[in-house]
Amino acid sequence: MKHRSEQTSQNPAGIKAKTRKAKVKQADKTPSAKKKLDRKTVIIIAAAGGTVLTLLLVFGIYYGIAAKGLKDDASALKASIKACASALKNGNASDADNAIIELDSTSSRMRQELADPKWNLPKIIPPVRQDLETAGMCLDIVDKSSGILLKPATEAVRDSGLPSEENVDLDNLGKETGMLFYVYADLIDNLSPALTEVMTDLDNLPKFHIGMLEDAVAKYRALPELTEQFNTLIRRAPDELLRPAADVMTDKPFDSLHKDDGIDTSVVIAYMDLGSTIRPFVVDINKQINEGTFLEDFPEQVKLAQKLDDISSYLDKLEHYKPLMQALIGDGENKMYLVVAQNSAELRACGGFPGSVGTATIKKGILKFGDFKTVYDVIPQKHGSSIKFSESEVTLFHKDWYVAKARSASANPDFPRCAEIWAAAYGRSHKTKPDGVISLTPHIIQRLMPITGPVTLSNGVTLDENYCIWYLQHDVYFEYFGNPKYKGKANDITDSLFAETANLVEDKLMSNPDMKSALGLLQVLEESSKDRVFMMWMKDEEGQKAIEDLGFSGALNSDPKAPEIGVYYSIKAANKLGPYVVLNTTVGEGKLNGDGTMTYPVAVELSNTMDEETLKFGRNNGYLTSTKYAGDMKSVIYFFAPAGGTIDSFQCDSKVKVKKTTYNDLEVGYASGFFVKPGQTVIFTYTVTTAPGVMAKPQVSTTPTLTEYADSTPTPQEENGE
């Protein structure tokens, strides 16, 4: 075969002709040469593209890792800012310094990272270049915030005189909290322009193209608008919230409430006045926060809203109780109140026999509680000379009982009248006439236990929020009346243990008072007034009106528009059968009458739950179950109609006769002298009709019993793990 060059040189024309013929044939049978070239080009480009994509992927991973490092540093920045803010909030300059050092260090490290030459290549891509520039702007904002906000704020806290390495407890309303509030107020006044400057820079910050970086700053983009929304309130805060609060906290810190073994009432009034002063501002800012559009983006704002809700609620309570406290404390004059502990084991219509009585006195502005003593040493049996009895009182509450003995005043469920009788009797045998009477049943002691914690009695028994009343009203009697060595002394011992418990709880409540315990006490009193566990009476008309407005009076129903059915029960005998009384009242559906009144069926079940074993024990220890009646409850029961209404159609499954009369313009049915034997239930049914035009279903007011505490047991003691 000849070489191609030789062929060409010998017959060039022939070769050209063949070539032309070949091209014609190829045109008829195969794709064009250009298309063949395109396919090759595609293959080459694809190969090259794959190489480029591989390179880009490698670079992307590399720079993605670098970007993630920036994101991690950004998270560290946020953590430092949060730590600094928390330290400043708690008045801890030392922790704030440490957080700022960490913040500045992280910012510097990020700047060095952004200046690294490795970023030169990706900078040729516009979005990456823009993100790197935006990251630098973020660091500018961080550095500016550190320089013109955080560092001046830290210096202000340090210069305030607060301990530099300790947190201020913002809940104790003490002098240090007041000092910190002064700092807050000055900072808001002085740093508002700097804050505006930082917010403007943040508002002008471009968005990141890299998603993970934008995610790190996205929620903070709302801060400028949020600050603008609250700008007016922020500027109001120093003079309408912080400085007024600081004035009170530094002048009358809440921890100065306890003074000379008593309560400094000027501190109480100061904080109530403060509540009235700052309440409008707190209401405004609370409303603004709850109506804001950023709650989902800022969990801190949710916490603040919840905190302000609590504060607003506290201030409402302070405002609510202020008239009562002013009436109780007065204008600096001396006051004295009886504090009566009604014994539910010896059940009476108003609560119980007044087994223990203490005093609350206010002298030179200091409130002190005297020790509880047995009623026999405090309230005489004879009535005060000012007490005169109506015919209905004699009929309902018995001449040989209520009328004859001042200590039996609780046979009348109308607490203002009962308290008036006790106060008059006390005044008869003492030089001082009480300004009022405060009534407590044992229930309140157990309700206070979550605030005070457990107490241990002199006999070694520990009482807590789960086991207290059942011991004092039930178990203690079996412990002492059932032991021969306490014969003749059991009654005095059990009464003294009850008084000891009351004194211990009172001491713990008053020994280290703070706002939380004070508000907790108010809440317990408010709840306990609803079921007649806590009641008050004052001889001063203005004070009594404040008590009535709060619902603390224990008075019988007097408002036809708020109808109330009264069911009250007494055991007319000396015994401790109260724990076995179950009193249930059910009000059925009402029926509209032609005259616009509503009639309701009512059923009352009265049970004696004493079992045979207890009865046997009681027979051997007569005072528990009544020596004379051996477990049978000698009963007196009252059914009061709602104000402006009527009561009728009495029936009883045990054929107990119910009579009718009136008391203070209220219709009342009553039955007395009947017995409820152990294990027996007596059912009364009747109807009540409300005043015309009153559609509200009547509520039930009744004597508080011990049913809810029945059979509660001591909390198991943890074993010593040594």
Please place each PLM-identified region on the residue numbering.
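Non-catalytic, solvent-exposed segments at the cell envelope interface
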Residues: 2-4, 21, 34-48, 59-710, ...
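Acidic, low-complexity/disordered segments
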Residues: 716-719
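Alpha-helical transmembrane segments and their juxtamembrane interface "caps"
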Residues: 50-53
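N-terminal targeting leaders characterized by basic, low-complexity, disordered sequences
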Residues: 1-33
